[in-house]
């Protein structure tokens, strides 16, 4: 289903209850909003027959805590499947990297997809190379599971550890 706000309406909750009652397999491919997961909703989501996994958006550092809270609630009611996180890469390299790495360190049950931020009002926007490289590393699991981002070599002669050195020069005290 393509409704990232399904948890925000009573009608949406009724639809999920119907999905559970009918035993339908479902995928909310636009990601759910973890901030809206209550104990009752977690209990309901744990009963859903997911096609693959539960999807959440995790576009800011504050959403990590909300996703963690939601995961704990849903798991409390017996869900043992995978979780998938959409991570938009914003302007801050360190913040984006730390958010992505948080889920990497949680293990294979937590899968994520990264996408550079695209400004729909600026069709000529230039995507920073670090965003391209970070999303390339994350989204291709053969790289993501076999090396750390610092060691990732997206182009001959360039390792991504360079991004950490560049940021240290830009940010005093880093």
In which residue ranges do the predicted regions lie?
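Core AdoMet radical
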Residues: 1-70, 81-91, 111-115
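Generic hydrophobic segment detector
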Residues: 16, 58, 62-63, 68-76, ...
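Surface-exposed amphipathic alpha-helices with a cationic face
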Residues: 20, 71-78, 101-104
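Generic secondary-structure transition motif, activating predominantly at the C-termini of alpha-helices
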Residues: 20-23, 49-50, 75, 138, ...
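Auxiliary Fe-S-binding modules of radical SAM enzymes
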Residues: 88-174
């Amino acid at each position: 289903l393509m409704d990232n706000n399904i948890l925000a309406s009573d009608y949406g909750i009724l639809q999920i209850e119907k999905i559970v009652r009918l035993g339908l397999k479902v995928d909310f491919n636009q990601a759910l909003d973890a901030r809206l997961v209550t104990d009752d909703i977690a209990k309901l989501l744990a009963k859903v027959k997911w096609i693959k996994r539960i999807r959440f958006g995790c576009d800011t550092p504050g959403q990590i805590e909300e996703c963690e809270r939601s995961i704990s609630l849903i798991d409390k009611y017996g869900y043992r499947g995978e979780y998938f996180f959409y991570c938009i890469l914003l302007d801050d390299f360190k913040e984006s990297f730390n958010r992505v790495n948080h889920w990497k360190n949680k293990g294979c049950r937590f899968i994520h997809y990264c996408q550079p931020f695209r400004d729909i009002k600026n069709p000529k926007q230039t995507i920073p190379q670090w965003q391209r490289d970070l999303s390339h590393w994350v989204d291709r699991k053969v790289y993501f599971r076999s090396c750390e981002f610092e060691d990732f070599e997206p182009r001959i002669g360039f390792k991504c550890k360079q991004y950490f050195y560049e940021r240290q020069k830009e940010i005093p005290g880093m």
